[in-house]
Amino acid sequence: MAYTSPPPSRSVLSNKAHRYRILLSLRSLLDRYLSWPLPPGPSVEIAIPSKVSKTPGSIQLYFFTAPSRPLCPRKQTQRLPPRPVLINFHGGGFSIGHARDDSRWAGTVLKAYPDAVVVSINYRLAPERPFPVPLEDGADAILWLWQEAQKYNFDKTRFALSGASAGGNLALAVPFRLHEELQKQRWASIGEEIELAGLVVFYPSTDWTRSRIERDATNPIAPQKSIIPPSLFKFFDDSYLLPAGLPKWPGTDRVDMSHPYLSPGLAPESLLLATYPPAVAIYTCGWDQLLVEGNTFRERLGGFVEEGKMASIGGFVVEDVIHGFDKKPSFCRGNKARDRMYGDAVNQLKVMWKID
């Protein structure tokens, strides 16, 4: 993806981000407090220090649990079955949004699996913290949860990731960064009994080699139906994709937009098979500029299943809906398309978590 003009200053982008965040938070409030059935709120919030990123700071983790199964340190005398964990990344173009925006998805998971724990990551946002900070915060959160697994009775072998839009990109790319980090001696204390059980991803970006115009061209109905104006897409890209921090082609100063950390759909087969769990589900939207690249990646992973290299690939196209359709306040009308997508995704988790 080439820049045709210098991006705006970081201060200008930060001012825009502040305004956009206020608007999105209002929409989220309408969904969380005025749309039925009401989703749950987080039961616990914990701040952890960033260790993976070179940019110091803290990362907020929001824990969602069923009322009957609160999050609390396990007593030595307790012998309860370890709990499966879903680690979620919210959307918002890496620049806006909040971990609470996915409360409805968390509630759907907990209704089906009351013993589960959903952890929504409030990763640090661009333009203040552009690529690769959100990606590194995701790896940091997983590493911390693995380290604390015994204390909170988490099942280290049943960690699944989920995310929508930009969060979907993170859910698909974080395993690569996590794999790189785990090669370092500093994480030896985590132990060997760790692995990701699955990925559940909603309308992700998977191929940053395509410009926004090129993405629209792959699905011409998308710009007609989208409620996201081109100016907002440009803001997202300018905020997150700060050229100085982007991957470069080896031995050059040219930005490599095909790098797996940006474009997980283009990752080499060897990396995918070394880092991905055996089960992945990708859901795409029929009226979305990201439809084709998401479908292409799902089909590519499906080829690994046919070759016996992965266990299962799920997900489908949700027809006649726009990007982010499940986050719109529904008030008393409900959202049948969202319910169908979330319902299927919950069934995918049953397979990933090996729940009878």
Residue positions per predicted region:
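An N-terminal hydrophobic leader/cap segment in hydrolases
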Residues: 2-51
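Alpha/beta-hydrolase superfamily serine-hydrolase fold, recognizing
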Residues: 9, 13, 20, 45-356
